[in-house]
Amino acid sequence: MPKTIRIALAGLGNVNLNLLRILRSQATLLADTYGLRFSVVAVCDSSGGAAAAEGLDIDTLIATKEAKRGVASLPQGSPSLVAQTIVETIAADVFVEATPVNLQTGEPGLSAVRTALQKGMHVVLANKGPLALAYPSLALLSDMGGDVTLPKMRFSACVGGALPTINLGRRDLAGTVIESVEGVLNGTTQYILRSMEQGGSYAEALKEAQDRGLAETDPTLDVEGWDAANKLTIVANAVLNQPTNVRDFAVTGITHLTAADLQAAVANGERIVLLCRGVRNAQGSYDLSVAPTALPSDHPLARMSGWEMGVVYHTDISGRASATSAERGPMPTAAAMLRDLIDVGR
C-alpha cells in the first residue's frame, strides 16, 4: 500500500495548478515507483480556501480554476480560509507554498511557512520571498539548519525552476570546497539578451518576451536584476553557508544594454549574460554580485539559448560541475516541486 502524504497548498496559480495536473497524471508512477500517494487536504487562493480531511478531489480543483472560479466557491470552501489559518488548523504533513512573491515583507508566505515548520509540517516552496528575506531563521526551524530531526524544508523550484541549482551544490558536491558559483538564473533576461543579440532593441525584445508570457507587465524585478539577486541570496545561504541578505552585494540589471553591445561581444568571441556570481576570497567567504557579464563563447553559460538557464560550480576536488534547463512555461517549476515532495515524503 502506498504511503499517504497529506498536503496543503497555498496559492493556486499556474505553478500549483500544474502541480495538481502532475499529481493526477503521475499518480500511478508515484505509487508504484516511490510508494507515495498525495492527498490534497487543503488549498487556498485569492478567493479563500477549501479543506477536507479525506482529501479534495483533484479533478474538481483543476476544473474550478480552469473555469476561472475561486476554490472558496466549492462546497468545502470558505472565504476566511487563508494560508495562515490552514497551517494553524488543518492536519497536513506538507505545506506547499506558491503564493505570489513579496520581496518587501515576504508575507503572507513567510508567516505561514514559519508556523508550518513550528507545528512540525514539512515545507516545499516555489515562493522565493520567505527564503530571500529570512533564510537563516527558517533554516533553524528545519533540517536545513543541520538538525535532521526537524521538519524538512525544500525549495529547489525557487532557484531556476527545474534547474537543480540547490541539489547540485548542496548534495552532489558534498565534501568539496566550492571555489565559485556562476549562474544564469533569470529566464526573462536571458531571453531578452539573446533576442537583442539578433539586432532588436531592448524595448522590442522586452515586448516580445511579454507577448510570449515570459515577462511580467511590470518587468522591473527581472530586468533590474533583483529576481536573479534573490536567487543568488538563496544559493549563498543554502549552498555556500554564508548568511546573506539581498542588499549585501551589488546588483546591476540589463536596461542600459543595446543591441550593439550584444553584437560587439559576439564579434569578440563572447556573449553577454546576466550573471549571478559568488567567488571564494582569501578569508573563506564569498564575494557576490549580479551583473551583465561577457563570457567566452565556449563557456557553458554562453552556449545557452534564450530558453535556457544554467549553473556552474567550480570546486577543489570535483572540478567543474554544471547543469542547464530549458523552460518554456510553469510546468518545469511544478516538476521541481514534485521532486521536493518526493524527497520529503520518503
Where are these regions (language model features)?
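ATP-dependent carboxylate/acyl-activation modules
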Residues: H299-R346
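General beta-strand structural signal in soluble alpha/beta enzymes
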Residues: V94-E97, V124-A126, M153-A157, S180-G183, ...
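Rossmann-fold NAD(P)-binding glycine/threonine-rich loop
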Residues: P100-K119, K128-F155, G169
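N-terminal glycine-/serine-/threonine-rich beta1-alpha1-beta2 phosphate-ribose binding loop
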Residues: M1-Q118
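Rossmann-like NAD(P)H-binding beta-loop-alpha module
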Residues: S142-L150, R154-A215, W226
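Substrate-binding/catalytic subdomain of NAD(P)-dependent oxidoreductase enzymes
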Residues: S195-M196, L206-R303, E308-G310
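Conserved active-site and cofactor/substrate-binding residues in soluble primary-metabolism enzymes
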Residues: A10, N14, N18, F38, ...
